[in-house]
């Protein structure tokens, strides 16, 4: 367990921080607090395949991570991406869907192998 200098939660202080914003729209930031919270993120503008509601074809591609320790001493860490596919977090403590049963996998493979019906 890390020693806590500056307290936990609302008493925590920022012990390191970076923030870089570039003219091309890319950026990077990170910080760490005295109670062990950490976060970092970087992003850049990206050409997207479909225009948004305002007709813009530029979007952001972001990736980052954050971690913290709860009051019980459990450590949590999340890595994520966010882009035209949405927010996609990953972490050992996050629930995952159950595996697809074999019979359903076979049925889906069969359906995919069939020619498309024309209307």
Curated annotation (Swiss-Prot):
UniProt region (Disordered), positions on chain: 33-55
Role: Component of the abdominal endocuticle.
Name of the protein: Endocuticle structural glycoprotein SgAbd-3
GO molecular function: structural constituent of chitin-based larval cuticle
PROSITE patterns documented for this protein: CHIT_BIND_RR_2
This protein's UniProt keywords: Cuticle, Glycoprotein, Pyrrolidone carboxylic acid
List of glycosylated residues: 96
Location of Pyrrolidone carboxylic acid modifications: 1
Keyword Hydrolase: no
């Amino acid at each position: 367990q890390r020693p806590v200098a500056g307290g936990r939660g609302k008493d925590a202080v920022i012990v390191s921080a970076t923030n870089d914003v570039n003219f091309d729209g890319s950026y990077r930031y990170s910080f760490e607090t005295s109670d062990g919270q950490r976060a970092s993120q970087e992003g850049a503008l990206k050409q997207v395949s479909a225009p948004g509601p305002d007709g813009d074809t530029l979007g952001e591609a972001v990736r980052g991570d954050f971690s913290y320790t709860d009051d019980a001493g459990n450590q949590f860490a999340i890595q994520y991406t966010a882009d035209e596919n949405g927010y996609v977090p990953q972490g050992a403590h996050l629930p995952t869907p159950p595996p697809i049963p074999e019979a359903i996998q076979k049925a889906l493979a069969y359906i995919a192998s069939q020619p498309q019906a024309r209307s």
